[in-house]
Amino acid sequence: MTLFSSISSMSTSMSGSKSSISSFGSGTGMGSNSIACGGGCGGSGGILGSGLGLGLGLGLDLTGGSRSRGACGGNGGNRGNGNGGMGGGNGSCCGGPCCGI
């Protein structure tokens, strides 16, 4: 398993039924595609909530349904809101030229 080595900071914020986990450039995850789509390009929208992905790249995916988001945008994973910094709609950056993979 390949991990991206970088400084990561995680913060969990609970508000009603929403939970967002932010991670800067972390490619660690347990999802099916979280490593390939992780790091600066992001992974999924997190476990439960929206995960903003403001150019930071959300690389944590524990749901197994990761889609590229964060800096490259894309889908938000299983239940995320795909609010990536550069937009996108269906995870087209996952494994694509946008992420350089």
UniProtKB/Swiss-Prot annotation:
InterPro entries: HssA/B-like_chaperone, HssA/B-related. It holds the Pfam family Coiled. Residues 1-26 are annotated as: Disordered. GO terms for biological process: sorocarp development. Coiled coil: none annotated. Belongs to the hssA/B family. This is HssA/B-like protein 40. It comes from Dictyostelium discoideum (Social amoeba). The gene is hssl40.
